[in-house]
Amino acid sequence: MDPTLISLGALALAGAAATVSGCAEDLESDVGSQSNPNSQVQLGPQMGNIHRYFNKAISGEPVSYGLYVAVAGSVAWALINAGLNAVLALIIGSGVAAIVHGAYSVSAFLGRTVGQSQKFGQPVYMDVLTSHIGPIVGHGFIAVFTMVLAAYLAVTALGNPFPLPLVALIFGITVGAIGSSTGDVHYGAEREYQKYAFGGGIPVANQGDIDIYAEYGIRNGLDSSYFCSRLGGPLTGLCFGLIIFLDGWRSIVGNIIGGDLVTKTSIALVVGLLVVVAAMILNRKIEVFARNKYGPYRN
């Protein structure tokens, strides 16, 4: 079969895996309230808002997912070199990473909550721990497995020269950064502050004054993930999937058109710059359209 067709097929599969990974990563961070929005959850009890959110900001998402995916990639790489089937090795590696993820989540939740219990009266809700840890580990496993799968395809089928653990680390940092910058806005700026008028941002005076009541009963992280699965999660997945696909696509275009290595690299760089410029123009047009359509926030 034509090597170009094999590369295109592997790239399409890697892009699809990255899309699923980005969506699952964002929803996992919504269940556990990690990264940027967690600062508001941490401030909640200090503002008198006793809540039932799962408070587990172990670190920023880029660092934590860099760790999880690197653990999965390292275990899978060792097992593959030992002669184990690649798919089974990726599953086992992702399972080990899920255990690490769960251990960090439990310790972070208990440590951060206990630190606020005496002075600010925030209880440690054990039912929140037991009900949230499953979705956290489950979403995390999906995100890590699809991410390490994309890294494996990059190494074996797309010609990436670096070893699997290093590529997995880079991909994990990338998906964490995208989830933190793209999907968390939907959770932190909207879901946590639905009692305030939409579009007003989060003034300093309102920080920590988060919503503690849901549509029915007391709000928790599971409610947040359900809400964000309609917009924040899919947008995170789409963003990361497009990055993986377009980055690989520019390299394939360079290999098809170019002759020697320098020409291939130059064409790939030019195509990449054109994609970035097109994305900037499209982003600007969407922003101007939205401002003209809905107008400035006046209150």
Curated annotation (Swiss-Prot):
- Residue ranges spanning the membrane: these are 57-77, 80-100, 133-153, 158-178, 237-257, 261-281
Keyword annotations for this protein?
A: Cell membrane, Membrane, Methanogenesis, Methyltransferase, One-carbon metabolism, Transferase, Translocase, Transmembrane, Transmembrane helix
* UniProt GO molecular function: tetrahydromethanopterin S-methyltransferase activity
Main enzyme class: translocase
Would you tell me the Gene Ontology cellular component terms? cytoplasm; plasma membrane; vesicle membrane
**Recorded superkingdom:** Archaea
Catalysed reactions, semicolon-separated: 5-methyl-5,6,7,8-tetrahydromethanopterin + coenzyme M + 2 Na(+)(in) = 5,6,7,8-tetrahydromethanopterin + methyl-coenzyme M + 2 Na(+)(out)
Kindly list the places in or outside the cell where this protein is found, as annotated in its UniProt entry: Cell membrane
Q: Name one GO biological process term.
A: methanogenesis, from carbon dioxide
User: What EC number(s) has UniProt assigned to this enzyme?
Assistant: 7.2.1.4
Output the InterPro entries linked to this UniProt entry. Answer: MeTrfase_E (IPR005780)
In what pathway does it function?
One-carbon metabolism; methanogenesis from CO(2); methyl-coenzyme M from 5,10-methylene-5,6,7,8-tetrahydromethanopterin: step 2/2
Q: How does it sit in the membrane?
A: Multi-pass membrane protein
Q: How does it assemble?
A: The complex is composed of 8 subunits; MtrA, MtrB, MtrC, MtrD, MtrE, MtrF, MtrG and MtrH.
The similarity annotation says: Belongs to the MtrE family.
Physiological role:
Part of a complex that catalyzes the formation of methyl-coenzyme M and tetrahydromethanopterin from coenzyme M and methyl-tetrahydromethanopterin. This is an energy-conserving, sodium-ion translocating step.
The protein's name is: Tetrahydromethanopterin S-methyltransferase subunit E
| Species of the source | Methanococcus vannielii (strain ATCC 35089 / DSM 1224 / JCM 13029 / OCM 148 / SB)
